[in-house]
Amino acid sequence: VMLGLLLVAGIGVAVLLGPYALRVEHVAAEPRTGFHSDYYLYVPTTLHRDERGNATLLVQPNNSGRTSDDIGAHRRDAWMTGFERKRIADELGVALLVPAFPRTARDWRTYTHALDRDVLTTRDRLLARLDLQLIAMIDDARARLRKDGTPVDARVLLQGFSASAMFANRFTALHPDRVRAATIGSPGGWPIAPVAKVGVDALPYPAGIADLSALTGTPFDAAAFARVPQYLYMGDADDNDSLDFNDGWDKPMSAEVDRLFGDTPLARWTHAEMLYAQAGANARFELVPGVGHDRKALQERSTAFFREVLATP
């Protein structure tokens, strides 16, 4: 009987995981190509094509929710993230890329999964400039698909929630020319402001974009950023605030954000919305009544936004 139950359970797992497991490609790190971590690429059976015949790539940054020096733990989490987002890729008819970036315990202050300031300054090649590593992954995935006869838009759909929303939001500010549209769910208490200062107060990265040139060698491209359709959303009962922790923010900078804009995610929300409007951003902000820090309750809003974007030439 026990053997029979195990067999049934095994078949159930195979049926559940099968459609994703059979189609997902595990791409190993390729430092010479510019990425030091693995990624997962899932291609649904049917791909939506734009008017130029290009398919689209949806990028979902990984977020393990914890530090670990075991890269296998981050890979397993990234694989499961892809499995959970498979339905979205199928619905939209887009390929799905999930990086397996590590978030190490040995260097816990470098909050890789949120693309924090330390990621732009560290000398550790595994963790450094994950924005550029992700671009290398995107271009590697595009080359693989092109080899199979599927040209892919250089601009991606980018979505995230919590830490991965911080990554998606900050990546969009760093590389707006590579983003077709972005959905940003509960971005850690403060989305990056697309301005250099508020009044006389400078807003360095990741509070704002004041020192992007010094950090990256490339100035903020305000015109390209303004062209990216963005949807920023949060439950009005969400009190998840990355500014309270030392891994993602330097204390003086988080204190400055608290002083200027309020000390809770909800208090800061309208300030962020106003700064995006003043910068001419094509950004829709939405507070969802009665919802806390709940990705699954809010995912359909992100999917619907992308559906709208894909339907627009």
Predicted features, each with a name:
Residues 59-61, 234, 288:
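Alpha/beta-hydrolase
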Residues 5-57, 65, 69-71, 86, ...:
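A domain-start/cap signature at the N-terminus of enzymes
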Residues 165-176:
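Short glycine-enriched nucleophile-adjacent loop
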Residues 64-141, 272-275:
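Active-site machinery of serine-nucleophile hydrolases
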